[in-house]
Amino acid sequence: MPQDDDWFWGRPTPVVVGDGETTSKPKPPVAGKTKKVEEQHPRRPGEPDCSYYVKFGSCKFGISCVYNHPDPRPQHGADDKKPAEQFPRRPGEPDCSYYVKFGSCKFGMNCRFNHPPRMPVPPQQEYFSGNACHCHHIEGKSKVEQVKLNVLGLPLRPGTGLCSYYMNRGICKFGTNCKFDHPDPGSDHEKWVVSSNANQVSSQVNIYSVLDHGESNEHTFTSEEVHQPGIPSFHQRISYTRDQLLQLCQNVEVPKDILKFCQDINVELNGEDKISGFGAEKDHVQTPSYKRFDATDSRDWHSWSAQTNWEQKFWDNFSEAKEPYSLGWKQEKFNKPDQSSFHFDSKDQWLKFIKCTPCKSTLIKAEVPLSIQRGIISGKDEVLKTLKSILNTFSPKMFDLQKGQLIETRISSADILKDVINLIFEKVVAEPAFCSTYAQLCTYLNQNLTPFPPEDCDCEEITFKQALSNKCQEIFESAHTVCSEIGKLIGQDREMEQRDKERVVKLETLGNINFIRALLKKKLITNKIIDHIVQAVMDCCKFRFEPLGKVDLLNIIFEGMLDSDSAGDESNICVNAMIGGNKSSIASNDVEMTRKNVNRQNEEAILQKSYDEVPNNKMDPQKNYADGAISYLIEKEKPTNLESSVRICRGGCSISEIMELVVDAGAVEGSDEHFMATLLFIKPEYREIFLTLDTREGRLGWLKRMYKVKE
């Protein structure tokens, strides 16, 4: 029957295997039960252990495995060490590093190294974690001492000293891990704990009496509970009602310094010599409003400020004074130690002091304050300020909108008109890309601005066109003066200054010429300005570091004037003369060609002849030599001279013929000069310039300079 019971409950039945060895043979499970049958492995003492079973805890051969399958459960009290024979000891050989680290060796008895005996590890004392153990742990002792706890759950350690944190606050942040003593509140130390907490509560009361708490809190403590820190609720935050705070406010004695300070503040703000709040007398206690922003201010600030308007001006003048003013006031203050500190009991005393005390610092104050100076702006400055704001945002897209704004600025005098033209020229130099737009703006102003009366009664009325022409002439005359000053800068120590000035003058000259070219198209200035342009270019060509070459001159003039209908015969002849100078044994690539090759002996005669032949004596005898040289070139120029006349030889050669001349000049195909020629000769004006150069060196040099300019 026992076997039947085992079969019924699903227990394995012992089975004899081999040499009297017993094992358990599982019975088939009862129907309706899903319990998994544990896999069985034979135990064979004396046989080597099954390595697969030892490593993974199972064996695929099961009950038929011929090796031993030890019990995986540890046996308490048994020696778990492996036999010493498994790891050989070889004195004199180095120790097996793997055995020393891990206590085992995979080679076993076949290892060639020494396996020293391992030192037994003493059993370590294990304790609970600090938060879980309630015992007192003493280092160096294996015996555990039980620690008692007080009513608050803190350890009692007599003889180790009192916990200062606990004695001051009634709690301990270290809890059961604290190494000091925490006596019960009812012990001999109760008086000390109660007195310390009473001081803490009184300090909190002083703080809460000043602050504004509004309505009372729901959870409150009585006075008895406040002075009993031993109860568990004492760890929570202490709260008070408004009545308790007011009662404490009346009982607490406020220091006299604080009362005096509050009195001074009330005098400054309210103008009343009263003390309100917790510092008032007990018989006349005024309950302040504990709603900080609910009460409305009933004081008449407007009438008070109107009555003391002069006082406000005094403080304005004081704040607007500069640093010397303030330093002088401070020096005067420190020189008189009896007046170094002032105390006013009321507003009337303060006003009386201001009226009676002489202020010497007002003697050095400016007659017109800075705030008033800022408000006084002349009509001219206001107009110029408006014009600058408009021109700073000037663009072709906004032209239609901004041109009307310029007219609305009320340009009402000749001085304002000159300043407007100066602003336009400054913007042109800074933004040369908008030259055509600014020329269009000048046309609009010329049409819509009425003439202005002259400064002198004998002169004619000043128009916009006349003022613009005068400005152009002044620009080139001043540029000529600057160029002459730059030529006087000699020495290595002034090379940087000379270079910077040359660059500035060159950029200004190019910007002004571009703008004048656009004005010539609009017929706003006469062609006489061409003489000044040529003179300015010749002056810039003398620069040492930033010279303005002939290529720049030709590009500027030909792009704007040559195809323009506004440019008359005079300007065209002038341009042709400068180009045709290359044919008359003059340096082809130098703008100063006339100054180097004209016969000096006939120079004065040529200038006098050109001056006599000019009708109405338009040419000034004090003109520079460049004007005479250009007149000489104009006289030599003939309309039938096809080689020097740009207009007659226009389009005379095809592009293929000109490219042959380019190759013949030394610009091999694939070079930078040949590439630049293919880009430039699409336009007829560049082909005409190239044909006027008669030497190969001159043509090749012209292409090289054009390549540098385009870069």
Swiss-Prot record:
Cross-referenced InterPro entries: ARM-type_fold (IPR016024), MIF4G-like_typ-3 (IPR003890), Znf_CCCH (IPR000571), Znf_CCCH_sf (IPR036855)
Basic and acidic residues bias locations: 35-47
GO-annotated cellular components: eukaryotic translation initiation factor 4F complex
UniProt keyword terms in alphabetical order: DNA-binding, Metal-binding, Repeat, Zinc, Zinc-finger
Domain MIF4G: 384-637
GO biological process, one term: translational initiation
A Pfam entry, by short name: MIF4G
Region (Disordered): 1-49
A GO molecular function held by the record: mRNA binding
ZnF C3H1-type span: 44-72, 90-118, 157-185
Highest taxon, organism lineage: Eukaryota
UniProt keyword Zinc-finger present: yes
Keyword Coiled coil: no
Record protein name field: Zinc finger CCCH domain-containing protein 43
Lineage, uppermost ranks: Eukaryota, Viridiplantae, Streptophyta, Embryophyta, Tracheophyta
